[in-house]
Amino acid sequence: MKAGKLSESILKRSVLRQLHNSAVRAPGVGIDFGAVDASAGKQIVTAEACRAFDTFPEAGVYAALNNLVCSGAKPLGITMTLLLPTSASENDLRAWISAVSRVSEKEQIPVLGGHT
């Protein structure tokens, strides 16, 4: 893929279409925020960022979730920034997004957005 942001068609086809999402405001083109329903009692919002350089994309998601859970927080959503080398193909992108989507669905934590 070429350097820079993904084209809108690749974003829709290889990222947004794959995400299992139960967020109140799901990710979309030009949407720079996400929303979850946190009305079940008093809520404190926390955030965690974890870099993943592996060929095992789930590891980065689980590392970030682990940091939140160990601090006593209940994760309500996932945001991600995906930086791929120019040698990556659209199939590589799809594989990463598919892995993140599997974690999202398994852990019942929606993907709220991110940057690609």
Each PLM stretch: what is its role?
Residues M1-D54, S71, M80, S98-G113:
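Extreme N-terminal cap/leader segments of soluble proteins
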Residues E58-T116:
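A glycine-rich phosphate/pyrophosphate-binding beta-strand-loop-alpha-helix module
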